[in-house]
Design a protein with these regions (language model features):
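N- or domain-start disorder-to-order transition segments that initiate the globular core
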Residues: 1-32
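M16/MPP (pitrilysin/insulinase) zinc-metallopeptidase core fold and M16-derived inactive scaffolds
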Residues: 36-104, 108-112
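Divalent-metal coordination cores built from histidine and acidic residues
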Residues: 114-117
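A common structural junction motif
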Residues: 119-121
């Protein structure tokens, strides 16, 4: 089969880390001083067996219950202190073939956002 891919915009930088994580970076001048980080995990409801129903969605929710660098409600507390509110800003969703975590954050706090996504990955 001859598969054709949609070409990537020339303004998008992308690559793959040694651990297999593929990343995409796109500069956007608006809104000024803001960034949106997303982690898309290839795990969704269609990949679950009958006895695993709901596991991807459950895992999505558990990410907000703590991580290596942010135990307990540390993720929510840390981001809230930076002006990112859980639910209104900080969010996630589980689809058929993916789970996506979304962190809109001030550009000056990118390292914190990346550290959280690294824990979740």
């Amino acid at each position: 089969m001859n598969v054709k891919y949609v070409p990537t915009d020339a303004g998008v930088r992308y690559g793959q880390l040694e651990n297999g994580v593929t990343y995409y970076v796109c500069r956007n001048p608006m809104p000024k001083g803001k960034a949106e980080l997303r982690l898309a995990v290839r795990a969704g409801s269609v990949m679950e067996d009958e006895h695993e129903r709901g596991l991807a969605h459950f895992t999505e929710h558990m990410a907000f219950k703590g991580s290596s660098h942010f135990p307990g409600t540390g993720v929510i507390r840390e981001l809230s202190a930076l002006g990112v509110e859980f639910g209104a800003d900080l969010n996630a969703y589980t689809g058929f073939d993916r789970t996506v975590y979304i962190i809109p954050i001030a550009s000056s706090h990118l390292l914190t956002g990346v550290r959280i996504l690294a824990d979740w990955a």
